[in-house]
């Protein structure tokens, strides 16, 4: 992965309420979003619905707001659970970064101090550009603390740090 990722935004798939926010096996819309990112020379796609970020093509987007809280999309709005976030959330909070689900509106994203994305296949990555627009200051406090927490989990876990380098 590059030091700082770039993203494009794509329309999120429409799921009925029973399926929304669950890992149900129909990955094609996510694969299509990933392909669109690559076609547009971006690293990832962010899925948008009603002017809000609800998920990533293969990751959970998280932003550090000007209020000091880290926000991630809510499951009830279509985000999928993040195993990576669950692994590091308590440690982030213990290190002074409260983590909360939120409606990640475009205005919230645009005022973010920083953004990262988390995924079991990518670890912790810094996100610095969305649709050609710079977002916050990449590789700042959120990235550094999240990466430190993630590397600690990996070093005491079943996967090797080398798997993510």
Segments predicted by a language model, with ranges:
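Helix-start/capping segments and mature chain N-termini
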Residues: 1-165
